[in-house]
Amino acid sequence: MTKYVFVTGGVVSSLGKGIAAASLAAILETRGIKVTLLKLDPYINVDPGTMSPFQHGEVFVTEDGAETDLDLGHYERFISGKMTRRNNFTTGQIYESVIKKERRGDYLGGTVQVIPHITDEIKHYIRVGAGDAQVAIVEIGGTVGDIESLPFLEAIRQMAVQLPREDTCFIHLTLLPYITSAGELKTKPTQHSVKELREIGIQPDVLLCRADRALPADERRKIALFTNVREEAVILALDVDSIYKIPSLLHDQMLDEIVCHKLNLLAKAADLSTWKKLVHALEHPERVIEIALVGKYVDLTESYKSLSEALIHAGIHTRSKINIHYVDSESIEKDGTGCLDGMDAILVPGGFGKRGVEGKIMAIHFARTNRIPYLGICLGMQLAVIEYARNKAGMQGAHSTEFHPETAYPVIALTIEWRSREGQLEIRTADSDLGGTMRLGGQECLLKEGSLARRIYGSDKIIERHRHRYEVNNQYIPRLEQAGMSISAVSAGEGLCEMVELPQTEHPWFVASQFHPEFTSTPRAGHPLFAAFIEAAAVFADKSPSSEGAISADKPERTTTGAYIQ
């Protein structure tokens, strides 16, 4: 039977519940425990697919095509298991399911209420999401005290009552603010947060106290006394410069031992040697690489969370420190490409809407004409095709029908039909709903023999995750190829364009993909496409007049992906 660890948060949002949950899962996994994670989001949206990145941050896409919370990306990066649509659900999904049941008459004419119907549905979703895991770590989104979180908190309270005592554990993450004028950490917000949680009927077994400095012993004792939590279970969640240090930080304070004791789990000792090697590689780079990430959501970098982490992973596996410069594409439209001077590589990520598109195209033109390594992802590939069509293939005014429906050269057009991972035919039109109607999830791609893409992946067939409505218009591929652009990967079956590249006689490293490789990058394994991108940037930096990217005069020997972390 599955045992449950429930993770809640108090005082303020964005304290890092997802990182804490993922770190605990990583430690338990090294102890031989089969673990999974769930994220419960209290908002009424069915999923975050149509939410603004400025409000929600990144939308993480799972292998089975679910648009989910960005915390699922952290989960996949910290443990070996893959998340599915069952690992993330929202208030919207719960109410939608209950209302459908009511319409079918499943409640036999009874009055449908939050308790028991909504809470029962939440418990059902938790059990289904846990699957056959030994331990399911369940993160409750939001903050204790939020009205929308109450049904979720009531549901997990009921589970603690209904299950044996040793089958549940509650972890509460709070903030210990430091008041400069007083010169001390303040515990009162934590006391009140736990008080509010206890009023709901939940007594935390562990407190994770987020702070920017050490927690004095007397303050720890004070927190334990006033929250009814054992002193050894009051654990400091110290601010660190890398999230990949958190597993060791929590393990050193015996969090995993406390949880295993509460859940009555017998497990081998934790082995965090891989995580320690990873952190060592992160802290001992041999070069610095400057990457320009040109996007429209740069004011909230959480919008590109998986992407920034994938670049960090590539840095780990190439012994490079990655400095990411977030560049607003609209600023390029206004002020030109001067902000890209000194960059070792340029990356244009995915995005939606017309705003900032021409600035991204200008950045791509700058990368191509100056032979700077370029990686385009999703929209970044589509705009690379548009730039090449305009400036090399003689199609002046070429555009995407997403932004310019009347363009004379619609080199990017709506994907009308394709087959899902399960082989089901999917058909879309311009009038289709926005939510959940894109080409989503893992899709098989065939790599062209002799292409740079095939050399990078070392395979003729890959599966990568997608999230898009528009695609390269096959009608214009012959003209693009005649001008010099190569279609280096296509989808299995439909022959949709999946990757483009330029011959290395024209450009040393110019690669773009319709899919999102960042969703499958992990710190332990990295990702071949990002590693190759960073290696290309390192070569460019070495050839630059100043070579300012070098940490030492002795250039390290290049190595293959994954050589440093076993």
Curated annotation (Swiss-Prot):
The active site is at C378, H516, E518. CDD domains: CTPS_N, GATase1_CTP_Synthase. CTP binds at S13, D146, I147, E148, K186, T187, K188, P189, T190, Q191, K222. Residues 545-566 are annotated as: Disordered. GO terms for cellular component: cytosol. One of its GO terms (molecular function) is CTP synthase activity. It comes from the Bacteria. InterPro entries: Class_I_gatase-like, CTP_synthase, CTP_synthase_N, GATASE, GATase1_CTP_Synthase, P-loop_NTPase. PANTHER family: CTP SYNTHASE (PTHR11550), CTP SYNTHASE-RELATED (PTHR11550:SF0). HAMAP family: PyrG. CTPSs have evolved a hybrid strategy for distinguishing between UTP and CTP. The overlapping regions of the product feedback inhibitory and substrate sites recognize a common feature in both compounds, the triphosphate moiety. To differentiate isosteric substrate and product pyrimidine rings, an additional pocket far from the expected kinase/ligase catalytic site, specifically recognizes the cytosine and ribose portions of the product inhibitor. This is CTP synthase. It comes from Nitrosospira multiformis (strain ATCC 25196 / NCIMB 11849 / C 71). The gene is pyrG.
